[in-house]
Amino acid sequence: MSELLDLPRRILEDLDGAVVGKRELKRLLLIGMLAGGHVLIEGPPGTGKTTTARAFCQALGGVFKRIQFTPDMLPSDVTGFYLYRTDGDSRFIEGPVFANVVLADELNRTTPRTQAALLESMAEGQVTIEGVTHTLPRPMMVIGSQMPYGGPGTYPLTTVQADRFLLHGWSGMPSVEEEREIVGAIDRIERNIVNPVVGPQAILDLRREVAMVHVSPLIVQYILSLLEVIRAHDAVAEPVSPRVGIALFKASRAAAYLDGRDFVLPDDVKALFTSVVYHRLVLKPESEADGRTREDVVRATLEAAVVPRGQEFEG
């Protein structure tokens, strides 16, 4: 491990000064960044989704853009458009998706067509406007926030769209102690500005180090076992895609790196399984009618899959 490992720890320290609590969510954002993926944050209004995401974006440095999604937004408001002049010439006006870190706020407040414009750019790393392809900056990370499904005026992401996010995190209500701290220190919190800790090149360097973390064949088999069990669960309507296994592989490496290890343990996989699979999971209508939840399916899967024990996981 190199001195680069100190950078994620410094980001966490700065986030703690700007956002009360939410330690698990902060760690999840870091894992997403290190793994080269995008993160979807879900929670009710006023629980710090935007505040946490904005502070994290500030700490990452580079070019930061925020998109406040609304029902009347067009795809061109996200990706950009060509501006034509009277003499026949044109120039491309970049949309807010052209950034190193994009905060997609209240993503499920806009129409599926506009959602797709963002999510396709996330998957491809480029946008095509009027037949011309424009490459997005590297690195490019999207942090999406959304209201809980079923809220008024929401457009739930499709399974394919949700699959573009590596991880899903919850932003729940603060504890009594956390809420007391928030209320008592609100002036300081609102004034706090998170200074950039890293930049685009440092993020790319960190990702290269994460890619060197060893993943034992036993860990790979454990990941595949989890996929096999959850696909066979009688409450699941659609088998989860192979992207789940890939996401779990990448996120587990990032978690191990964040903990100062150059190898993955089964506990890394177990700890991240819910965040990787939850937003990709679709239950049968009759299962939901019976009161079964995605949490139930995830819990049953973790209990059923055989965890490798007493083995050598180091490379």
What are these regions (language model features)?
Residues E3-P44:
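Pre-Walker A (pre-P-loop) alpha-helix and adjacent loop at the N terminus of AAA/AAA+ ATPase modules
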Residues L28-I31, Y84-L103:
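Conserved alpha-helical scaffold flanking the Walker A/P-loop in AAA+ ATPase domains
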Residues M33-T70:
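Walker A/P-loop
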Residues G43, D105-E106, A117:
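Walker B catalytic acidic pair
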Residues A59-D87:
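AAA+/P-loop NTPase substrate/partner-engagement loops
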Residues R85-G88, E106-T110, T114, M122-V213, ...:
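Canonical AAA+ ATPase core
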Residues I193-L248:
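Conserved AAA+ ATPase small/helical "lid" subdomain
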Residues A232-G315:
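C-terminal engagement/docking regions of AAA+ P-loop ATPases
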